[in-house]
Amino acid sequence: MKIGILSLVLHTNYGGILQSYALQTVLERLGHEVYVFNREQQYDKTRWKYIPKRFVKRIIGRDVVIFQEARYKKEAPMICQHIWNFRKKYIHEYIIKSFDDIKKMNLDAIIVGSDQVWRPCYFKSQWNVGIENAFLSFTRDWNIKRVAYAASFGVNDWEFSDQETQLVAEAAKLFSAISVREDSGIKLLKEKLNLNSIQVLDPTLLLSRDDYVKLIEKADIGKSSGNLLTYILNPSSKKTTFINEVAKAKGLIPFSVNNSNVKQTAPIEQRIMPSIEKWLQGFNDAKLVVTDSFHACVFSIIFNKPFIVLGNHERGNARFDSLLKLFDLHDNLVVNLDSYSFERILSSRIENKKIEELRIKSIQFLKQFI
């Protein structure tokens, strides 16, 4: 079958890129021709938000925002070069200007997922369309199979307006099957849309550690600079202090797989993002991981590494709760940094049988409905 994957927009998000890569890979191994929808790189996403400020700044001669956008547009190819190279090499992207462009592909099926594709604030801002499109409303009159794989709402609450709820309810009726990433998603779909669904694994968990090690080996990169991997999406002084205390208590050397400096005033060499393979290498080399990222937790599990996850309410705690419950690792979640005992022994060993059972169940879902 010829299949298209609709997720969030691909740019530089490590987890987002790898989950699309993983789902594409699994589907190809099942014998399908697969494409991942993406849009042309947008540099001016803040345009409308800043119109009043821009007008004032133009009048007084300090058009800071416009200059920042122009600078980013110029520098992005260098800052993002390694990540974009991975996408170009491994992901079969189909660039669209609007969802109408998809019709001419003559697809047999579209899979929605994974990632927080059903979180309105993310999907609408990234694709610049209504959330009903995440439920394939634009395919209403198409002869096509519609399936959701590990789609995520990201949170436990229903973030749709009444009008949006009505629109997605109509669109969702056309799906052949729906699976979600979090157990809370099952409840939301039943309560709000009266739809049945099942829980499946994030696509990245459908591939083995060996699959990711092969990517690392192909890239031929050096060892990481430490053994305490830190991957923090929302940095703060409290988190930095916490990481330093963990390193001291465990006798480990912290290292990061973020770019070393995110300030726009920093030299561009310091803002170049590590490659996907370098990011994966970090998990392979780590003895312990500290993160506030969902997919960093996932890859800690894949590489069988102990990890500490710092609760990240802004990005959706439901994802962490569901994942940790699935693998009985809820003790790894830290909500209050001030009360953490640095002598705690963290779980890292997950029975291979448990992962394999969930993997078989998840792949069987794809085999059955695609």
Residues covered by each model-derived region:
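Active-site anion-handling motifs in enzyme catalytic cores
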Residues: 1-370
